[in-house]
Amino acid sequence: MACMKLGSKSDAFQRQGQAWFCTTGLPSDIVVEVGEMSFHLHKFPLLSRSGVMERRIAEASKEGDDKCLIEISDLPGGDKTFELVAKFCYGVKLELTASNVVYLRCAAEHLEMTEEHGEGNLISQTETFFNQVVLKSWKDSIKALHSCDEVLEYADELNITKKCIESLAMRASTDPNLFGWPVVEHGGPMQSPGGSVLWNGISTGARPKHTSSDWWYEDASMLSFPLFKRLITVMESRGIREDIIAGSLTYYTRKHLPGLKRRRGGPESSGRFSTPLGSGNVLSEEEQKNLLEEIQELLRMQKGLVPTKFFVDMLRIAKILKASPDCIANLEKRIGMQLDQAALEDLVMPSFSHTMETLYDVDSVQRILDHFLGTDQIMPGGVGSPCSSVDDGNLIGSPQSITPMTAVAKLIDGYLAEVAPDVNLKLPKFQALAASIPEYARLLDDGLYRAIDIYLKHHPWLAETERENLCRLLDCQKLSLEACTHAAQNERLPLRIIVQVLFFEQLQLRTSVAGCFLVSDNLDGGSRQLRSGGYVGGPNEGGGGGGGWATAVRENQVLKVGMDSMRMRVCELEKECSNMRQEIEKLGKTTKGGGSASNGVGSKTWENVSKKLGFGFKLKSHQMCSAQEGSVSKSNNENVKIEKLKDVKERRGKHKKASSISSER
């Protein structure tokens, strides 16, 4: 730290308790009281340097007191600063530094220590040191600005605060790698390929290491928030990038709000400052609340500028500190703008409501999701734009537009599964949150099915109608085979949903089996061609006839094993469907009076139930699969007949050839 030495005399001041004495051999003729400290000094050194002291001593002398008493209660810097002022008046050695120059400059102005009362007076000395030394250094400017807090009114009047902020903003807006600072100021290491170093202030080839854009975060976080806010405002006016400004705001917030330090070393930490250092002054709850609200207003409303985790932490602290409703609403809106970048742990927030109706703050998550959906509809080319649609269960649209909504759908499904065990969570809240996600956003409904199953498990008292209404959110066509298998055996699901699941699972299996038959038939035809015609192709094509034949045989065997397992599964499902059909027929008989109904009535009841469940196309699909299987078997029989005819023709040809040879003999 730079300094400037003043005076040449040895220190003649001694402290005894709450009093300072000047041991020059002459008795003291004036007592100056500054706060709780008293200074026993001499009149001449003081009045020869200060206009205020000259007037006060003259007024005291008129009263005829031999030893006058002067009280100074509003001196900038207090008794510590007056000690340095007194030493300057006596010509005692002292050092001007970046830490005390602001106090001395303000005190000199207050005491009117101008050039009229002595050449090289304290005002000119401090002004020269401040302008020519302090403002030329980042570190010294930070220390000087930090000291302005206690004398802010005087510092503003003398433009000291403004000069410090302008100097800091200028250096922060300039690429530090162009000039070698602030690495040199911070004592950073040097790169020297040839082993050269800095010698006598002259660079001999050494280069400072590359400095990241966040090098000033820690120094700026030492300032009080009013000064920090003024510094950030000037930096923005100088064109510093918004992401750098946002990074400094998040760093400052994490340092001064203890509740935000629970996640250390997260992805939001960057550069050489992995975690903010602790602050010596702990803010009160009211000060923390005010700081949080101020920071929230300073941050730009721009997606991706600040990590979502930071906003989630701020929202949690805002609810603990009971911040204003506007602050909480803005934080929820910010999270909603970039909800696709959030993690599941970010949304699992405890409820801080006085009523404590639920364990988790589901209402806040609902509002966040609504903000995301609303922002998505407004933004051009968003995931909710008309260009994204669903056609026959397949998503149509660019991957860039589908990805955010799909990620949010997966996130909300995970959140629903997380909060489902809460017995206090009402069905309307759970159902409303699940229904907020558009249908096209879920590629599979497995996550939603899992959440509903957990909710039904922990809410066994729900009525059958409530269960059916909740399960209507499921699209059975979007369930995977594993989910269908689990749902078919799930006793918590309504009967209507189980029938739908079994039907669609059977339909999927029939389609898969039919496809396997077609593939197997094609492979059988190819293998027969290989057996009849041998390997056709050049020496460089493929890997030989034997390798191709073996591969085809292996694939055919694998497909046959798969078809066998599918046939068994289809048979099991058909048995289950027939059993359920009988049960439904019995239900239909009982509703009609309990009489014995004919098979026609039972089948008619089943058809009615199928229509209600949306199974109108079942027969058509079944006929299609049966026709497909019939065509496959028919083609197989025709192939067998053709092979037999070929064998008969070959035998006849061989017999004719043998008979002709014998006749010639």
Swiss-Prot record:
<feature type="domain" description="BTB">
    <location>
        <begin position="28"/>
        <end position="98"/>
    </location>
</feature>
<dbReference type="Pfam" id="PF03000">
    <property type="entry name" value="NPH3"/>
</dbReference>
<dbReference type="InterPro" id="IPR027356">
    <property type="entry name" value="NPH3_dom"/>
</dbReference>
<dbReference type="GO" id="GO:0005634">
    <property type="term" value="C:nucleus"/>
</dbReference>
<dbReference type="GO" id="GO:0016567">
    <property type="term" value="P:protein ubiquitination"/>
</dbReference>
<protein>
    <recommendedName>
        <fullName>BTB/POZ domain-containing protein At1g30440</fullName>
    </recommendedName>
</protein>
<dbReference type="Pfam" id="PF00651">
    <property type="entry name" value="BTB"/>
</dbReference>
<keyword id="KW-0175">Coiled coil</keyword>
<feature type="region of interest" description="Disordered">
    <location>
        <begin position="626"/>
        <end position="665"/>
    </location>
</feature>
<dbReference type="InterPro" id="IPR000210">
    <property type="entry name" value="BTB/POZ_dom"/>
</dbReference>
<dbReference type="InterPro" id="IPR043454">
    <property type="entry name" value="NPH3/RPT2-like"/>
</dbReference>
<comment type="function">
    <text>May act as a substrate-specific adapter of an E3 ubiquitin-protein ligase complex (CUL3-RBX1-BTB) which mediates the ubiquitination and subsequent proteasomal degradation of target proteins.</text>
</comment>
<keyword id="KW-0597">Phosphoprotein</keyword>
<comment type="similarity">
    <text>Belongs to the NPH3 family.</text>
</comment>
<comment type="pathway">
    <text>Protein modification; protein ubiquitination.</text>
</comment>
<feature type="compositionally biased region" description="Polar residues">
    <location>
        <begin position="626"/>
        <end position="639"/>
    </location>
</feature>
<dbReference type="GO" id="GO:0005886">
    <property type="term" value="C:plasma membrane"/>
</dbReference>
<feature type="modified residue" description="Phosphotyrosine">
    <location>
        <position position="449"/>
    </location>
</feature>
<dbReference type="InterPro" id="IPR011333">
    <property type="entry name" value="SKP1/BTB/POZ_sf"/>
</dbReference>
<feature type="modified residue" description="Phosphoserine">
    <location>
        <position position="279"/>
    </location>
</feature>
<feature type="domain" description="NPH3">
    <location>
        <begin position="214"/>
        <end position="508"/>
    </location>
</feature>
<feature type="region of interest" description="Disordered">
    <location>
        <begin position="260"/>
        <end position="280"/>
    </location>
</feature>
<feature type="coiled-coil region">
    <location>
        <begin position="281"/>
        <end position="306"/>
    </location>
</feature>
<keyword id="KW-0833">Ubl conjugation pathway</keyword>
<feature type="compositionally biased region" description="Basic and acidic residues">
    <location>
        <begin position="640"/>
        <end position="650"/>
    </location>
</feature>
<feature type="compositionally biased region" description="Polar residues">
    <location>
        <begin position="271"/>
        <end position="280"/>
    </location>
</feature>
